[in-house]
Structure formats: C-alpha cells, structure tokens
Amino acid sequence: MAAKDVVFGDSARAKMVEGVNILANAVKVTLGPKGRNVVLERSFGGPTVTKDGVSVAKEIELKDKLQNMGAQMVKEVASKTSDNAGDGTTTATVLAQSIVREGMKYVASGMNPMDLKRGIDKAVAAAVEELKKISKPCTTNKEIAQVGSISANSDSSIGDRIAEAMDKVGKEGVITVEDGKSLADELDVVEGMQFDRGYLSPYFINNPDKQVAVLENPFVLLHDKKVSNIRDLLPVLEQVAKAGRPLLIIAEDVEGEALATLVVNNIRGILKTVAVKAPGFGDRRKAMLEDIAILTGGQVIAEETGLTLEKATLAELGQAKRIEVGKENTTIIDGAGEAVNIEARVKQIRTQIEEATSDYDREKLQERVAKLAGGVAVIKVGAATEVEMKEKKARVEDALHATRAAVEEGIVPGGGVALIRARTAIAALTGVNADQNAGIKIVLRAMEEPLRQIVTNGGEEASVVVAAVAAGKGNYGYNAATGEYVDMVEAGVVDPTKVTRTALQNAASVAGLLLTTDAAVAELPKEDAPMPGGMPGGMGGMGMDM
C-alpha cells in the first residue's frame, strides 16, 4: 500500500478551498445571458467551446491532490444538480463557493464548524419554503418556451421548439434530441405507439416508395413465444381472411415455414400480413406486449393466461386504425383499446416509476408511459459545424430538462431574483447561539452571489444592482441581457423552482461538508527512481600494429 500524506486543520482546508476556487472561477464565467465561453481541449479533433457549467466542471482535474479533493467536491454539486434538475449547475457552483469562502473566515476565527453547519442548514430550509411560496405553476406554451430559452443561454428558437414539442406530445410525452442533417432545427412527431422492431422479411413491404408496409384497419395478434409451425397459426389466419382485413403478428420470433407461408400469402394477395419481433427483452418484453394489448384492445396469447394460438379467436386480437412497419420501427396509430384501461395502465406504470431505484429503469418506464399516453417527438438539432452541433445539442438537452422541471414544480423569477426575495425568510431567523447566527449570515450573503456574478459577467457594477434589486419587491429585477430593471416574469426571465431549490440545497450540503473537514488524507506523489548509469564506452583500438 502506498504511503499517504495526512494534513490537518487549516492547512488541509486552505488547500481544498484553493481547489474549490479554481473550479468555481472557471465555471462561473458562463453564468447569465452575457456569460463567456470556456474552451475545452480534446485529445483528438478540434477543441469544444461551451457555456455549459457542468461540461466545464467535468473537465477539471488538478495536479495537487488536496486541491483536487476540494474541486471534486464542488464538481459533485454541479453534476448532482444537473442530474436532478437538468440545469442550475453554474448557480449551484457559485453558491457553494460563496458558502465555503465566507464559512472559512468564521472557522479560522475559532467558531464551531458544526454549529455553523446547523445555521446554514436552518437558513437553507427556510429559503426553500419561501421559494415554494414565490413559485407559480408553468402551464402555458409561452411560459414553457421562456424557460427553455433561458436554459439554452437565451436562445429563443430552442425554447420555441421545445414548447412546440411539448404541445404536440403532451407533458408526459417523450422528447428526444438527435443530430440534424440540415442547418435549421427540425421537429419530428410520431403519433401513436412506436417501438424499435421492423418487418421480418422485406417481402412484406407494400409501399415501395417509402419502403414500408402499411396496414389499414388491421387485426393485431400478440404472442410471447416463437412461431415456427404454420399449423398453429392456420385457425386464426382463416378467421382473419374471412373478415377480409390485414393482420400484424407480433411474436418473440416468426421463422421457418410459418414465415415462408405468410410471405407467400402476402405476395399472392390472399392475406395481407406483416410479422415483427416483439420489442424489448425478458420481463420488459412481457410488459411491452401487455402495453400493446391494452392499447389495441386485445390480449397477449400466452400459456400463463391459458390461451393458445390454435384456439385463438378474433375477440382476442387487438385492432388499430392504421399500422406502419418500416425496416427498424413499427408505429401503431389509433389503437382500439378502451381509454379507461389505458389510463389505468399508465397509472400503474407511474407507480413503478416512483418505486424505481435505477435511472435506466426509470427512463424505460417513462418511455412506456409516453408511448401509451402521448407520443414521441424528436428535435433534430441543425448546425454548420460539428463543434457547434455538439455545443448546441448540449444546450437543447439542458433546456429540455429545465422545462420538465418547470412543468413539475413551477417557475420563479430568474436572474438571481428568486434567491434575493427568499432572503426575507432568512433575515428573521435566529439560531441557538452566535455560531449558528453566523451560519445563517453566510447563507444570506451567498444568496446574493448568483445575481452579483450575472451582473459582473455583463460588465456592470454588481453592488449597485444588488442594492437596487433588494430594494424592489416581487418580480422586480435586473435583466442582464438588456441592462434594464423590469418585471422578470413579464420579460420572460424565469427559472424552474426545482432548479433554484436543488442548486441551493446541493451547494449547502457540500459546502457544509468542506467546512466541517478537519483532516485530509492523500497519496504521496511517487518519487521517480533515478535513471540507471549509462553503459561504458565502446572498446578502444586493440593496438595490434604489425
């Protein structure tokens, strides 16, 4: 085991604060509408230019072990805020730096760090309650567009695209972000349920121009096992042929003579069918088949439910208005399922989302809700160069997270104003002793910091603006984009409540840990072994003169 360097007290804290400052100073220049760019080196290809706080934070690793510890703790603030709320990473970093900087002064003067932390926690809890009171619901398209624009660094076109997408697929719908093929941003909306499985044979295609199989008013047969024997399918195929309607078969797989017979029938025009594999794997496949059954008003033909293929009737098949099957996707439009059953299924999946422990499971469940309840929208990001594309795509993803957060918990006035207003709840607080009161003061001072930084990045005098905004009431604040004092909500400068709340809570949490640190243990740098001595020189002449 390598030897460790153990550093105590002020020496440890001072080094860690240096690390905090290095990271925070690099991140905070990106804050606000007039935030600056940060250029990140790449091991290959061109550098990345970004105004996204968390992207900058993730790049930073410091050579000094103790400094790096401090930097990594603040990096945790940024990434945690990004994961929870999707935005507010720079605000969280600025708040954490301020709490640490002010707190260290009190710790150095001999105050009890634990009481300081209790004071900080008390102040943050009061501020969060006040933020909830200030918050107002975000419901209109205009408000959603405003939140999206602010999070995308004041790019209104991105905000408009997100609002349009949410309008099309509903608040529960899935919105994904992809690289576009042109210079302009585009929005594609898939109505109905789409899953990522296509036709099993190109002979099913009946629309050669689009290379898809289109079924109008079809039956849908759902089976959880492989189908290889055509005899199993014959009874149900005969019933469908009599009804004179097409059939979509979704099974674990369709192979051998079963697939060959379906293809031959399709080519001869006897029965229009398409076979596709069931989406997902394992338990998720069963759940998705059940979703499709509820959406189309059919049943999954499975041994568990006591149903077999040979005895299947038209009553057990699902129905839809139209189904399109491409090479890689199948879209079911206007399934014949009962609205009550679909709603019950959505409710059931939502309960599973709340209980889900992994992000992956939660994401997959959310997709299932969207496919049942709304639809899927794809925002295709357009840009001139790859560097711009990456930067813009990151901003669109940020804005998307922020708008979801706004719809979830509402909005507060942006530009650092909400934190200034929330200070009123803290000003009246008193702690048990002087040290706790100092902790409350630390948070009071820190809550000015985001506004100060926004103004500083805009090239104005911060103290004057902070005093003017603090003297105002309600949504009155400073719009750094125009340099005017306005009603922030009317001007469209709003932040999701969840973003502001999460930023403050995460910043206080990590800053509190740093303040109560009294020792740091780091690996000693490895001493390079000296190079071995060189080989002796070559042999001289042998001196064999004849």
UniProtKB/Swiss-Prot annotation:
Primary location class: cytoplasm
Q: Gene name, please?
A: groEL
> In this entry, which stretches build a coiled coil?
none
Which region ranges are annotated with the description Disordered?
526-546
User: Any idea which UniProt keywords this protein has?
Assistant: ATP-binding, Chaperone, Cytoplasm, Isomerase, Nucleotide-binding
Report which reactions are catalysed by this protein: ATP + H2O + a folded polypeptide = ADP + phosphate + an unfolded polypeptide
Which family, according to UniProt?
Answer: Belongs to the chaperonin (HSP60) family.
**Any GO BP:** protein refolding
Give any Pfam family that matches. Cpn60_TCP1
PROSITE patterns membership: CHAPERONINS_CPN60
Under HAMAP family, the record lists: CH60
Keyword field contains Nucleotidyltransferase: no
Asked whether the UniProt record includes Manganese among its keywords, one would answer: no
Q: What does this protein do?
A: Together with its co-chaperonin GroES, plays an essential role in assisting protein folding. The GroEL-GroES system forms a nano-cage that allows encapsulation of the non-native substrate proteins and provides a physical environment optimized to promote and accelerate protein folding.
The entry lists its GO molecular-function terms as:
ATP binding; ATP-dependent protein folding chaperone; isomerase activity; unfolded protein binding
Name the GO cellular-component terms. Answer: cytoplasm
Tell me the SUPFAM superfamilies matching this sequence.
GroEL apical domain-like, GroEL equatorial domain-like, GroEL-intermediate domain like
> Subunit info?
Forms a cylinder of 14 subunits composed of two heptameric rings stacked back-to-back. Interacts with the co-chaperonin GroES.
Give the EC number: 5.6.1.7
UniProt feature, compositional bias: Gly residues = 534-546
Where in the cell does this protein reside? Cytoplasm
What EC class does the entry list? isomerase
The entry's protein name is: Chaperonin GroEL
Q: Which organism is it from?
A: Burkholderia thailandensis
Provide the residue positions that the database annotates as binding ATP. 30-33, 51, 87-91, 415, 479-481, 495
